Amino acid sequence: MNKLKSSQKDKVRQFMVFTQSSEKTAVSCLSQNDWKLDVATDNFFQNPELYIRESVKGSLDRKKLEQLYNRYKDPQDENKIGIDGIQQFCDDLALDPASITVLIIAWKFRAATQCEFSKLEFMDGMTELGCDSIEKLKAQIPKMEQELKEPGRFKDFYQFTFNFAKNPGQKGLDLEMAIAYWNLVLNGRFKFLDLWNKFLLEHHKRSIPKDTWNLLLDFSTMIADDMSNYDEEGAWPVLIDDFVEFARPQIAGTKSTTV
């Protein structure tokens, strides 16, 4: 790091804090991305295996990982971990299966559907994370959570959740399931989440299409406290148009009673 300019050293430090990676990895990734911090962090999170130089995969004990998989695999189907195995996996991690942390792990494993991991998803996911034990996976959790602070990565995680949560073969996501997952992933991120849930339960009562799911994230990040910046002529789904119409009088009423 001594040969670097002071501005580059600052970027290395910031990169290390943000990605929880080593100095060697930070220098390697930044130098390959023209020392643009935002581009480098985004590329790192999308393809960590391209930049991690600590030979994480080389130090992985494949036999140990296979034994770990065998602890969880379905007795009736050795190519997947079923619901009982997932429960054991969560118990070993001391995590609630319904927690956002378990959803983040599923995202990192690129899991296709809830309540199970295929053998390939588990083995590849653990390998990519450089983990051959529960202890190593536990140690990776803060890094995974940190990753979601980057908006592009959170968007990827959010969009993954729709496909993960829905029943295979169904186009839309059942309303109750959608609300449960919105409460998990948008809690603290969408100021009108409770009002949105109330609106859906009172006025919608149908499944949620993918475009509505995806665009709600954009809506949640741009909408003003009084919804005055909402463009009715914009390319928003009808459901979001209807929600704004439902919510505006309630927001105005709340403000007048608190003044």
Curated annotation (Swiss-Prot):
User: What PROSITE patterns does this protein's entry cite?
Assistant: DCUN1
- GO CC annotations? nucleus; ubiquitin ligase complex
Top-down, what is the taxonomic lineage of the species of origin? Eukaryota, Metazoa, Chordata, Craniata, Vertebrata
- Provide one Gene Ontology biological process annotation: positive regulation of protein neddylation
Q: Say if the entry is tagged with keyword Nucleus.
A: yes
Q: Does the keyword Thylakoid apply?
A: no
Annotated ranges, domain UBA-like: 8-45
Alphabetized, the UniProt keywords read: Nucleus, Ubl conjugation pathway
Q: Which gene encodes it?
A: DCUN1D1
Record-given protein name = DCN1-like protein 1
Q: Name one Pfam family in it.
A: UBA_4
The chain positions of domain DCUN1 read 60-248
What one GO molecular function would you report for this record?
ubiquitin-like protein binding
Functional summary from the UniProt entry = Part of an E3 ubiquitin ligase complex for neddylation. Promotes neddylation of cullin components of E3 cullin-RING ubiquitin ligase complexes. Acts by binding to cullin-RBX1 complexes in the cytoplasm and promoting their nuclear translocation, enhancing recruitment of E2-NEDD8 (UBE2M-NEDD8) thioester to the complex, and optimizing the orientation of proteins in the complex to allow efficient transfer of NEDD8 from the E2 to the cullin substrates.
